[in-house]
């Protein structure tokens, strides 16, 4: 059912529009002074009222991220790919979403250490998640999106990794404005990578999760023998 493809598209549009709205609010009310350089995303969402919008945008985005990660995990399993990489990838996707929520709820002006921990989960773990998804793209058959989706994911993951490294390097060199630009580009790439799941979800007929009671395997059943004297 093609409607499932709207889920990752909604996340991409929601998150992209949301953080740029926060940027616009922070600039318009003077919370951010562009003459001091281009601001980090978190700096734009530090002060109210935009901090409220920032938190809501990231919380909804995190919820959608968990949902998408779970559906993608099950979709890969349904293609008879029971690789450990798929399970680890699900964990990475959930951690990325958790970090995103932490970033939105713990502003850097209030809880800097917690905020930075959330940013690490959102950016670094999120990047690792999409590296795993790139690998799974080549492992799973059929491959939706033809021969293009794999290279596109690979190139975007490479760009994301390079920009995260550059972001840290420029920050170390006290070139905060360039570092902030790298951060914004990384965020846009991650949103785009989530949006690419629309290619895979287009082919979903539906999804459901259920809990099964573990059944005892016959070979694992304990056999009791009693010797009777005759």
Curated annotation (Swiss-Prot):
Pfam families: Frag1. Modulator of macroautophagy that causes accumulation of autophagosomes under basal conditions and enhances autophagic flux. Represses cell death and promotes long-term clonogenic survival of cells grown in the absence of glucose in a macroautophagy-independent manner. May have some role in extracellular matrix engulfment or growth factor receptor recycling, both of which can modulate cell survival. This is Modulator of macroautophagy TMEM150B-A. Belongs to the DRAM/TMEM150 family. Residues 23-50, 105-115, 172-183 are extracellular. It is a multi-pass membrane protein. The chain crosses the membrane at residues 2-22, 51-71, 84-104, 116-136, 151-171, 184-204.
């Amino acid at each position: 059912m093609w409607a499932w493809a709207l889920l990752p598209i909604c996340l991409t549009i929601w998150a992209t529009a949301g953080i740029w709205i926060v940027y616009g609010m922070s600039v318009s009310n003077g919370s951010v002074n562009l003459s001091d350089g281009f601001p980090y995303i978190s700096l734009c969402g530090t002060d109210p009222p935009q901090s409220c919008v920032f938190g809501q945008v990231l919380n909804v985005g995190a919820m959608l991220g968990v949902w998408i990660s779970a559906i993608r995990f099950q979709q890969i399993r349904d293609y008879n790919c029971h690789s450990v990489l798929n399970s680890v990838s699900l964990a990475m996707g959930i951690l990325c979403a958790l970090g995103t929520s932490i970033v939105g709820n713990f502003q850097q002006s209030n809880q800097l250490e917690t905020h930075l921990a959330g940013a690490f989960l959102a950016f670094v773990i999120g990047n690792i998640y999409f590296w795993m998804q790139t690998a799974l793209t080549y492992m799973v058959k059929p491959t939706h999106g033809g021969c293009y989706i794999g290279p596109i994911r690979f190139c975007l993951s490479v760009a994301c990794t390079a920009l995260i490294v550059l972001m840290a390097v420029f920050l170390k060199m006290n070139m905060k404005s360039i570092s902030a630009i790298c951060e914004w580009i990384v965020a846009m790439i991650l949103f785009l990578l989530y949006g690419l799941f629309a290619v895979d979800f287009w082919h979903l007929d539906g999804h459901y999760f259920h809990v099964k009671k573990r059944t005892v395997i016959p070979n694992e059943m304990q056999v009791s023998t009693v010797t009777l004297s005759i």
